[in-house]
């Protein structure tokens, strides 16, 4: 425990300058050494002071924003990063000193604390999501189940900066540390186990509501009975590489046991992070190898696997390919596509059985670099696709805006990272993704007592997408993936998806990019038409929840997402290129999405090559614009 006696204003402002502050979270390297791969629990005096001021900033903002709430009940938790509990102690002291009713649950996954916060007034969560182990950060939220929105976040960030830059900032931090009532602090720690149990119970109840799209036991029980019945007839087990994450101490094992689904785990001791945290293909290999091992031992029912990140809100999928007799790692865009397919089919299935689920206006909310395959899937269910800027908060807030316009928004998320958010949740959750796939595999055709035939989810999709000839009763996930719209899309963790630029003025950079792109178009348009049938383009930008089409001035996208959509002669979109500076990392992200024009191997090869070529053109134009 740091005593902060030597803490200075200069140390605070220096640490502040290294922080990334955005609606998605406030992040920096908290490890005392400053090394991002350091697994120490220690932090510097400056970061201890920053942690105290973070707690005060949130409490001051909350008190002003919600002055009508007298007994302000806040839940605090952390993931399993080594510095998490250290930071939590300083935040606790600050919140107690501010007079709030604070409930500390220790380690919890992000979806877990956000489910619990729905019964309270807000939350503070200590996590740096998928970033390396030496990083850590803070997320803030209210009782609506998600992080605070962009506008509120701006106010809070400004308040925090002002506090850190005050002449007496270091003295404020020291006073917060020393003025905390030790008896109250001890009492908070003593109640941790009790509140953790409450937290888990809230999360478990919320899981069933999310999966069945209802709080009504008359709907929940038949849905889960159908899943159990199907799994009994065609056994399915699930494997998970928990990688020492917060999900080691969450509801996963309980939920699978309650639904009679065998659950196999590795790296299931909290805090023992075995490998890199980000759940992208290079780290999903451990789950894939575990599934191979299980099959070699005779556990042939293991069909699905997943690996969460450290805070347990993001997790991508491995499935057992019966066609190839080996595990296959799904790409993030494929995971999101399957989740969207399943949940849209599920809502249509429910509407066939229960009239309250019928809706004339249906939509999904996605981020701007989500592959266009989502539009093709949604169109089959008469569902509109609306796009927001990258950032979970933006996608969640867009969904709220759509619901205020009387849209039914069942699913939302960011295809670029595979994260699935299923209403009424407002945060990604891998267990919801797994159960979306289980519903897709298990909810099959049934005959109602009145004789009406209700198509299962996959059969429904095959019919609506014009692929009914591909449906068979004993289908596998291989069969499902064969029916997905085919696209080649840059992976978010690929080295070529990240550029490092010098120009911090993104409006200026994009203005220069526009001139270079327009010149490129004049020089290459005949070639692009000959190579891939591209005949026109449209620029689109996404800032927060707002999308601007037919953009004539690229600079107005500022620090938001900028996308060029390419069209064929029939005015159908067939590819896009995209760019945006990261709000949480020092990186400039780029990607390309290309439609495979038909099911032939030639078309697949051509699309694969064209995606590489188009992304290289795009990246070179950005680099050229940065050098001017």
Residue ranges and their predicted role:
Residues 72-79, 237-242, 591-593:
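Short glycine-rich or small-residue beta-strand-to-loop segments that form or flank ligand, phosphate
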Residues 304, 325-328, 346, 351-593, ...:
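Phosphate-binding and adjacent anionic-ligand microenvironments
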Residues 1-49, 53:
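Cofactor-/ligand-binding subdomain signature composed of acidic, glycine-rich
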Residues 52-74, 217-234:
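Glycine-rich phosphate/diphosphate-binding loops that line cofactor/substrate pockets in enzymes
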Residues 7-19, 29, 134-297, 347, ...:
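Gly/Ser/Thr-enriched, mixed-charge loops and adjacent short helices
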Residues 123-129, 241, 306-310, 412-413, ...:
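Short beta-strand segments
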Residues 68-135, 252-319:
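N-terminal small/polar loop signature for handling phosphorylated ligands or for N-terminal nucleophile
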